[in-house]
């Protein structure tokens, strides 16, 4: 189901709770909402649709990917960039890393570990910031 975008900064600033099996519907809602905003959005976190759970979805080189309970376990190659967000007006400067290693669970709650680089790494960092209550 396509959900409305949350723009309440006090809600967005809350740290997300871990995702569980009964949150898989939220993951599907995120995919539906991201797809509906695909012309100007490349990733979303659950708090962007008003759900305080640690779930992100993003465009992984042309295919949408879901991460439950993602955590960055390694990062390198710091750089400064400016990003925008559906939940916030305008663009803002932030620090990102060229290469990140992420641990997460897939939709079957199997633990995964993968290294991401470049644009995909930047998207993931932005969405994990949402999960951590960090507003760019």
Give the positions of each predicted feature.
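Positively charged
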Residues: 1-136
């Amino acid at each position: 189901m396509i959900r409305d975008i949350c723009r309440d900064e006090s809600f967005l600033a809350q740290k997300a709770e871990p995702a569980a099996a009964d949150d898989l519907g939220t993951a599907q809602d995120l995919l539906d909402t991201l797809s509906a905003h695909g012309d100007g959005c490349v990733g979303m976190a659950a708090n962007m649709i008003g759900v305080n759970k640690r779930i992100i979805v993003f465009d992984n080189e042309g295919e949408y990917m879901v991460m439950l309970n993602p955590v960055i376990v390694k990062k390198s190659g710091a750089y400064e960039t400016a990003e925008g967000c559906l939940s916030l007006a305008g663009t803002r400067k932030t620090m990102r890393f060229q290469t990140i290693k992420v641990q997460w669970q897939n939709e079957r709650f199997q633990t995964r570990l993968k290294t991401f680089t470049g644009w995909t790494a930047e998207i993931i960092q932005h969405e994990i910031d949402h999960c951590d209550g960090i507003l760019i």
